[in-house]
Every structure is written in C-alpha cells, then in structure tokens.
Amino acid sequence: MKKLILSRLTVAILFIASPLGHLNAQPPIIQTKFTADPAPMVHKGMVYLYTTHDEDYAPEGMAGFRMKEWLLYTSTDMVNWTDHGTIADLYNFKWADPAVSGWGGFENGAWAPQCIERNGKFYLYCPVQGRGIGVLVADNPFGPFTDPLGKPLIGAEYDSIDPSVLIDDDGQAYLYWGNPNLWYVKLNEDMISCAGEITKDKLIRKIENQKDPYHFQEGPWAYKKNGHYYMAYASTCCPEGIGYAMGPSSVGPWEFKGYIMKPNRKSSGNHPGIIDYKGKSYVFGFNYRLNFMITDKHHERRSICVAELEYNPDGTIKELPWWDDGVAVEPVGTLNPYKRTEAETMAWSQGLKTAKDDKSGMYVTSIHNRDFLQVKAVDFGKGAKTFEVRAATITKGKIEIRLDDLDGTLLGVCDISNTGGWNTWKTFVTDVEKVGGVHDLYLVFRGGDGEMFNMDYWRFK
C-alpha cells in the first residue's frame, strides 16, 4: 500500500507540474504494467506487440529481474494500445516447471521472445533463462499457445537468450540469438526443428579486452528491407544502446554501421524491435521512466517506448535521440468511438491496472479519485449524443468525459453506482454535449477514498 500511495502521489505531482501533452515527447506506451523486450509483428493490418513482464515487486538493484510470463498488446494506429494480458508463461513449458524439473530459476525465467507467422501458424520463440530456447505454436496470434516439442529447441549451452527469426525471400528461415555471442541456425519449414549446424558468428561480437561500446551484446533483431539485410542489437553493456550492422545475406558478413540510438546513463539495458507499418518504419525499445516516476532507486522495472525510424538513400539508418528527447509518434489511424472500445485500450493512463476474469476478459481496475485514461485520435464524425460504460463496483464513483486535455471541454459526467459486486457488471449511460471531429478523449475518474469501480468497455452513440 505504501508503494501504491507513493506512486499516485509522485505521478500526481508530475502531472500537476506538467500537463499530459507536455509530459514528454516520447512517453512509454504501456503504463498499467512494467514491460520490456518488445517483439512487434505486423499481421493483417494490425501490430501485435509481444513483451516480457517485469513484476511490480522486482527488488532494488540491477540484478533484480522478476519475469514469469509473456504479454500481448495490439494497435492499429501506433498510439492506442489494447492489453490482451498473458498469452503464455513458464508453465507452458513442462520442462521448465519446477515441480517437474526441480529448476530453481522460475522467478526470473521468461525472457525476450519473438513471434512470427508461417503457413497460417504462429510460432512464439521463448528463452527460458538458464534452460534454453523453447517454441510455442498457435493457430492465431492471441493463442492459445502449446509446446509441440516438450523440450528446448536450442539447448542452454549456446548463450540461449533473445531469439530473433527471419524468413528469407527463398523461404529459408533463420533463428538468431545470444549474449555475448551471436548464434544462428537454419530452421526447417516446420519452424520447430533445426536444419544444419548451430553456428557462432565471429565478426559481430565485441573485441575481447577492448572498450568498444558499439558492438553486439545481446537482443538481436534480424530483418530485410529494400534488398538490405539488417542486424539490430543491444550494444555492449552497460549501458546498452541500439546498434546495427548490415550485410549482403541473412548470415552476413555483418558490417557495423553505427547506432540507431546511443547508450544513455538513464538505462542499463536495451532491446530493439523493428517493423514497417502503414508506410512508416518504427523501432521499439525500453527505458526505466515509469520506475523513476515512482522511486529514485533502480529496480528492473522497464517500460517499452517506440519511435519513428528513418533510412538514408543508401539504406543506413538515421540516428535517433534517446527516448526522453525524441519525438512522439503520430497516429496513423483514428479510433471509432461508436464501436465497443475495451477499457484497456489507451494511449496514456495514471494509476490504473488491468486484470482478467472469465466473464469479461480483460478490464481496467485499481481506479481511484483523479486517475484517468487518455485515448488519442478519436473520430466523432458528425456528433455523439450519449456515452455508455460497463462497470462493476460495491461502492460508487463518476467519470468525467473531457476533450483534448485533463481539464478540457466537459462533454458530460457518468455516475457509477453500486452493482452488487466487483465482477457484477452493469451498463451506465449519460447524455453528452454534441461533439464532432477528431479529438483526444480523457476519461477522468472522480470519487471518494479507495477503489471506486472496475471498467470493462465504453462507447458513444
């Protein structure tokens, strides 16, 4: 409770001193959880962002990782992200279950994954720290994911963390991974077995006993664009930047080209994920900003960020400033408020958490007085007349519906009354001032002390 109070007080002071729009040019895109190791995938017009999860209770210090599951977020506009919760955890791998294996690293085992689609199946490559790299398979990107092998795909003896996958133009798939070495192997078309020998790349890693902060450390991200092969990576620790190399083939030889983002003392680690989406290129990574909004102590509680990426005519990449000094991405789409919008879809929030139950799936919880959520680029068209929300509570509260700022135009206030239980859901409706055009929407929560209600979804009519 003390930590929760500190978090709310600290964030409240920050927002009073600096309105949301000026908080920072490049804020973390997820605020309800600590997330890291972004693995974006584009599929049928949507971005699927697979992440690791740093637990809130991670202890102080740079070695205090607490990671037990993999999460999924989606977006169609690059600014509003929907939380789909846990899509896999260490229990998906029976060979990692401590009850079966006796393995003692379960509190810190679910490290950086990557998901890729092939022939209608989705393959989630997951490093189980200290045990190897496993692979899970599903029929759709939301899962459920299952382990087809019942054993690691790559054994623990090969620096087996941070997998990245590339399917080349000829259909040959490659799996890359490693720290401090870069390893790779060809995959068969089934994507769950290796074709040939595991190989250590001898050119890309740092030179022993030399201070060369731009070389490969970990977190490879392999991709091809406009005829060029790229290997992005977290550069020599610590702190880690995002470096990259280019080569003539999927296995190099790799030539160092520079930084995508230089190291910064504000962050110890890094992990790139790079995609093209709706005519633009993006790089994902992480910082520790949300952690330091709560405390001045270092905890391994990271937060994913994203920035637009630009290429030079020769294929090299323009260097970006550190996340805190960069430019926020612009929406590449709008949100339709007349369709059901899950409460866990947001661009920014204060004080909120997400949870899941069998009746409603994901929902927003931990709603207190003065908390809020923001949704960007909401297209009201010719105008809305009413606002409805599905909520559950044993107490009461209010939702202020505002435009473009925390104290922006007030469209209306929706009263939430006792529904008889925290998972007993009821729909509440209120009239709103007529509004049209594209705006940022703020749902600002008001009420007494303590938790007020849970929220499932909202929409305008």
Regions picked out by a protein language model, each given a short descriptive name:
Residues 1-26:
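Bacterial Sec-dependent N-terminal signal peptides
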